[in-house]
């Protein structure tokens, strides 16, 4: 029967590594419970707690909280647990009831973002989602180094979750999804599934004050959002020293061009610089700037030199732009082809951009030279509720058709072009 189990389980992936190749402190087992109880510790073998004298000498220097087994003991227990798991899957009467495996990782958490019940042939265990503390370190590696200090210091704020030890021992570290079902080898990237912002974002947000810090976001914060945060964070606290420094820099820029007559205006600009910096992007600009550009584009004040904040303000403020769909006639003189098609008319400030179309024969690009609105020819409205007229083909004169009301009565309508095509 053992040979049969080995043949069937050849398809599974079993890496050649010791069962505890990472830091995974296990709680001490209850005396009244055995291996089949609620503990992960095995009798005589398996992962022993770090406080036991047997595992103290076998623990590695890099992994002080984990014991190691010899090759013979590991192979014997591993093969026996594999066979028992196979017998439990085939039929309940073929062998004894399966116990928990001697390896430290015997299950796969399907979705690391939500609470999920781990399905495993060796048993069922629920891993609760760990709520992230704002005071705790940002990554699971930092939490593993500090031990269970954050959990033991705040027992009243958060109760014990399911799957956590009840005797106050340090909680086992939560790992992302493993490579295989029975594989103790976890992914190398421990920060693959982090709740809240990453370590880089946590270091950036630690410098901000408590009043500016909001609730942690539900999704992961990417590197681009971190860069945006670094750009926005230093601009909030603006002091008079920063305004004076900016005024001095602006004076050094404008002094060669405008001459020595600028100190009064530079002082005014130095006072106005912190106000413009403290103004949020959603607030409307001042009245002086509003009357400068009527078409929505920011017009520079006459005689004013370049400002260090002008490119940032230009990027933050959206320009006046809209897209309007039109119908136009396209005509290729080389191929003597004329067609009607919809195009997009982009208006940005005072610039009108036509999106070109290509001739189907010579592949040349053309702009529409006749513009008409998308209106119904019957009710003269852009959005109409007129009944759609289906095409009716006369058997005697197939080139005369009743088409849509949009092109009815036009000089070059659908029926005219259809008739012209039949005549040719």
From Swiss-Prot:
Compositional bias segments (type: Basic and acidic residues): 289-298
Signal peptide location: none
Domain of life, per lineage: Eukaryota
GO cellular component, one term: cytoplasmic ribonucleoprotein granule
Zinc finger (3CxxC-type): 326-409
Example GO BP: translation
Keyword Cell division applies: no
Subcellular location: Cytoplasm, Cytoplasmic ribonucleoprotein granule; Cytoplasm
Annotated disulfide bonds: none
Transmembrane segments: none
Keywords for the protein's UniProt record, in alphabetical order: Cytoplasm, Developmental protein, Differentiation, Metal-binding, Oogenesis, RNA-binding, Ubl conjugation, Zinc, Zinc-finger
Record note on modification: Ubiquitinated and degradaded by the proteasome during oocyte meiotic maturation, leading to MARDO (mitochondria-associated ribonucleoprotein domain) membraneless compartment dissolution.
One annotated GO molecular function: molecular condensate scaffold activity
Major location category of this protein: cytoplasm
Region (Disordered): 125-175, 196-313
Statement: the UniProt record of this protein carries the keyword Zinc: yes
Pfam families: Zn_ribbon_3CxxC (PF13695)
Ranges of biased composition (kind: Gly residues): 141-150
UniProt subunit comment: Interacts with YBX2.
Family: Belongs to the ZAR1 family.
Role summary: mRNA-binding protein that mediates formation of MARDO (mitochondria-associated ribonucleoprotein domain), a membraneless compartment that stores maternal mRNAs in oocytes. MARDO assembly around mitochondria is directed by an increase in mitochondrial membrane potential during oocyte growth. Promotes formation of MARDO phase-separated membraneless compartment by undergoing liquid-liquid phase separation upon binding to maternal mRNAs. Binds to the 3'-UTR of maternal mRNAs. Maternal mRNAs stored in the MARDO are translationally repressed.
Domain notes: Disordered region at the N-terminus undergoes liquid-liquid phase separation (LLPS) for the formation of MARDO (mitochondria-associated ribonucleoprotein domain), a membraneless compartment that stores maternal mRNAs in oocytes. The 3CxxC-type mediates binding to the 3'-UTR of mRNAs.
Protein name as annotated: Zygote arrest protein 1
Organism: Homo sapiens
